[in-house]
Structures are given as C-alpha cells and as structure tokens.
C-alpha cells in the first residue's frame, strides 16, 4: 500500500530510487512532512519473534538496518537512533516488550505493517489480522472502520464496545494451527502456511524481471529491491556503484584503508568480518569442509569446490585461443600469457622477465642465495618448496608416475610428460632466432642466451658469470671445496654429479661409447674424441 503522503511506497523511496524518482521523493519529503522511522519499522512480540525461523530473523535484521540507513541518507541529517536499531546493532533479540504485553492481552487496534516490506498476503496473515479475521466471521457489529476504509482487512480497527470485543478476541486467540507432518504448532496463519510450503518445497512466488522463484512472498519482495535500487549508491572516490548502502560502506574501506575487524590472537586486521572469520581458522586448525571422495579437509568451502574437480575431471575454464581447459580460473589466466608472450614480472636485479609473479619470487632467491626449504632427512636445502618435495622422494624411493612405453618411473607428472617426448620425438619449444627446437622450455630459455650473450648468474667470489643457475652452483664448489657427490664403491668424492657418473664406469668396466670406424669401445666420450683425432692424424701421414 503506497503511503499517500509521499505518492510512493516509503521503502522504495528510502532505498534510494534512481534519478528523477529519488529527486521527487526528496521534494515530497520536505513538502509533505518528514518520513519517520516508525513509518518503515516493524516490531514483534516475543511470541511472534520466536515463530520466525533463523533465515527470516536474519532478513528482518538486515532490512531494518538498511531502512534506517536509507532514512538517514534521505534526511541528510543525523537522526536520534531508535532503540530498535541500537538493539539490532548490539546483536540482541529485537522483540518489543510493550508489544509482547499487548499480544498477551489481545490488542484493540491491529498493528499496521508497511505493505511494501511485508507485502499484501503477509499483512493479511499477521498475528493480529489472523485474530480479527476469525472474529470477522461472527459479524462486524462491534467494529467501527476508519473513515475511507472498506473492510477489516484493509484498515486499523477502533474500539467501540470494549468488553464484547475483548471477549471475542480472547476466545479467537485460543485457536492454534498445527502442521501434521511434523506436529509443529503455530499461533498464526502465516507461520503455519509458510511452514507447510517447506514440506512441499514449492516456490510459488516468481520474479517477473529475472524469473527467480521463492517460497515466501517476503523473500520475493526483498529480492525485487535489487532491481528497483540497482546501482543507487555510488562511490565518490572511484565512481563504482552498488545496490546496497552497506556494500558501499564496505567498499569505501578499500580507499580509506580501514580494517575494523581485528584478530585477538595475532592482531591482524581485516576490512570484512567474513575475512576475519576465515582467518581465525588458521589458529584453531579447523578444517570443516571435507571431501566425501577422499576425506581431504579444507578450511574454505571454495577450496573444497576446486578440489572436487580433481575427482570429477571438470574443467570449466576454457581458453578461447587454443581450446585447452583448466579447473582453476587462475591457471587459465596464467596460460593465456603463453599466447600473448607477455612477461609482466621483471627482476630489478638482472632485468629478467617472467610471466608469473611466483616465478619471479623464486628467481629472486637465486640472487640472494637463500635456500629456505631444508630436508629433515639429510639437511640439503632448496630455494623452491617443490624441489624439496621432489627431493624427499629420493629417500622414500616413491615414484607415482610410470611410463607405459619403457616402464621408467617418475615422482612428478611433469617429469613423465617431458620423458614421453623422448619416445615421440616431440620438440614443441622452437627458437625464433635460428629455428632450433627443444623438448623442454628451460632448454630453449638457456639456448636463447647464446644469441643474446646474456649470463645472468654471477659468482660473488670471482665475478665469473654463467647462463645457468646449475652451472653457478657447481662453480661455487670450487671456492668452497665442497664435494657432495660421493662414490659408494671407493669413497672418492666429486663436486659434480656428472663427474661421479663417469667415475662409476671405472668400477663397472662399462664402455658406452663406440667408434664406428674401427669398432673400438670407450668408457668416456672424451676418449672417443681423442681416438678419432689420432686416427685422422695417422691417415694424413700415410
């Protein structure tokens, strides 16, 4: 029912109608008298409040706080904060004591709820209306309607004959409504009807604008406000608009840097209460979201959702360029850079650029020489956590990924993928400069340095530079005298794994290199080269 003083419903106006509608409301506001909080407020008795479920109570709190903020926004001045709002802000139950007493002794005048909030059917089904509806069956002799009203259902009811009316109201109030499936008892038509709808799971109330359905008219009415007040609240700093004043308030904290929600455990602050709630789980170690498939638990529902895709194989994020699909949006974003060739993350130390921030972070460690990830088994340290994880399998001997072609096992799927290229001969990484192709991207990156002459890995001790970090690591052992690669057969140690491999051949007698010219075998490629040179010298002298 539209408020006749303002020419439109108070709730719509208070929500901040777009453009001309808001201007018209402001004009009406000053011409026809101020709109008070009582005009847009709803109060409950304890009995009525307890009949609402938790979702309805939460919706009520949100709507009342929003109505008050809208009213302050409309008035443009500070208003005296109503007790109801103070109660809601403090998280207390907002039922009204005076109203509770009125319901205990049935009211002479029925409460008038704003139609735009509770809607037509909800108004008719309110607690007092239900009583009056029952009483209406016995005749309206004892009731006098307000001027201009057509029926009891439309208007406020005035007392004319106290005793008869009160007696009738007390009698009708004794009627209760019971739901057969759950034997739950209700004191109002509305709560009984709403409860029954939940058993049928029907959603009879449909939004004409977006076709979304609801089981309660109240929820539909609340939903409609999103369409009516679309982008009504605009941020003065960046121009971004929002449907809710509360959303704008939260957004403003990005500009102000305000973080009102502080963790009592560690002092870390957040700009949203939900972020604080999520953060607290770190301290408790709680992981309430568990995968039914494998039992793995997570502290965020979003993490569980992403994890489930491993089992289902769903990859909803597809690259429009090549058709490749991913189970995470972040993976798709990273993948797209392959097509663009963009490398936005640049190292300030050596100028090298990367397509991922995480790769740059890892790269920076090579300059610092820092190796924060240490193996508890042997003490070896790594500058990447993934390298440590991979290294640990050398102690366990675990190899999850097996090549179907040759039976060789690997502890990483990526290592198996690279290995398979040996059998297929695939070399997907091609140098644009000379056309040479490689089966690993890292080999192409190293190869490109031949053309550029770049040697980003420099020894702090002697200044010698290298184009591979592994070469620098091996070189540093010359200065430190470290020889980590030890022969189990004779105990001799070496500073390179390749040197140890060559040394082991002296014990096995293996000769891997054969010269096709004379059929002679050698245990080192260098010996083969020397023999080749000797052969040609002898040939030339003949």
From Swiss-Prot:
It is found in: Nucleus. Residues 35-107 form the KRAB domain. Its main location: nucleus. Keywords: DNA-binding, Metal-binding, Nucleus, Repeat, Transcription, Transcription regulation, Zinc, Zinc-finger. Belongs to the krueppel C2H2-type zinc-finger protein family. May be involved in transcriptional regulation. This is Zinc finger protein 100. It comes from Homo sapiens (Human).
């Amino acid at each position: 029912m539209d408020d006749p003083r303002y020419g439109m419903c108070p709730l719509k106006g208070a929500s901040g109608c777009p453009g001309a509608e808001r201007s018209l409301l402001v004009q009406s506001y000053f011409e026809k008298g101020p709109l008070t909080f009582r005009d847009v407020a709803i109060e409950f008795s304890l009995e009525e409040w307890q009949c609402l479920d938790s979702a309805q109570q939460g919706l009520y709190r949100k709507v009342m706080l929003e109505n008050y903020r809208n009213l302050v926004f409309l008035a443009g001045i500070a208003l005296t904060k109503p007790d109801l709002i103070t109660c809601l802000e403090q998280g207390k139950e907002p039922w009204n004591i005076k109203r509770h007493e009125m319901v205990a002794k049935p009211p002479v005048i029925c409460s008038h709820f704003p139609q735009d909030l509770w809607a037509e059917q909800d108004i008719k089904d309110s607690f007092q209306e239900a009583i009056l509806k029952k009483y209406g069956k016995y005749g309206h002799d004892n009731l006098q309607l307000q001027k201009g009203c057509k029926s009891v259902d439309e208007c406020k009811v005035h007392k004319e004959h106290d005793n008869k009316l009160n007696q009738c109201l007390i009698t009708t109030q004794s009627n209760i409504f019971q739901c057969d499936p759950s034997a739950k008892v209700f004191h109002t038509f509305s709560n009984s009807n709403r409860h029954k709808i939940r058993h049928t799971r029907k959603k009879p109330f449909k939004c004409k604008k977006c076709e979304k359905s609801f089981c309660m008219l109240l929820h539909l009415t609340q939903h409609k406000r999103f369409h009516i007040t679309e982008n009504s609240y605009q941020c003065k700093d960046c121009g971004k608009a929002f449907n809710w004043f509360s959303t704008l308030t939260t957004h403003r904290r990005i500009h102000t840097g305000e973080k009102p929600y502080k963790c009592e455990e560690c002092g870390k602050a957040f700009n949203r209460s939900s972020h604080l709630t999520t953060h607290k789980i770190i301290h408790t170690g709680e992981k309430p979201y568990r995968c039914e498939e494998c039992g793995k638990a997570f502290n965020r529902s979003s993490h569980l959702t992403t994890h489930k895709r491993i089992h289902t194989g769903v990859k909803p994020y597809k690259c429009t360029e090549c058709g490749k699909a991913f189970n995470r949006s972040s993976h798709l974003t990273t993948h797209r850079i392959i097509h663009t060739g963009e490398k936005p993350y640049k190292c300030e130390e050596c100028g090298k650029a990367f397509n991922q921030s995480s790769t740059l972070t890892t790269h920076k460690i090579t300059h610092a020489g820092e190796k924060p990830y240490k193996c508890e088994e042997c003490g070896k340290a790594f500058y990447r956590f993934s390298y440590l994880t991979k290294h640990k399998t050398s102690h366990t001997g675990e190899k999850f990924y097996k090549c179907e072609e040759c039976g060789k096992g690997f502890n990483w799927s990526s290592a198996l993928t690279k290995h398979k290229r040996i059998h297929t001969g695939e070399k997907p990484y091609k140098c644009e400069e000379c056309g040479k192709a490689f089966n690993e991207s890292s080999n192409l990156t190293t190869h490109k340095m031949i053309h550029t002459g770049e040697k980003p890995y420099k020894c702090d001790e002697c200044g010698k530079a290298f184009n591979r970090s592994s070469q620098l690591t091996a070189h540093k052992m010359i200065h430190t005298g470290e020889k980590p690669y030890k022969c189990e057969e004779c105990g001799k140690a070496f500073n390179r794994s390749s040197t140890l491999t060559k040394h082991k051949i002296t014990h096995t007698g293996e000769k891997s290199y054969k010269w096709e010219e004379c059929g002679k075998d050698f245990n080192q490629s260098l010996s083969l080269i020397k023999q080749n040179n000797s052969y040609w010298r002898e040939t030339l002298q003949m």
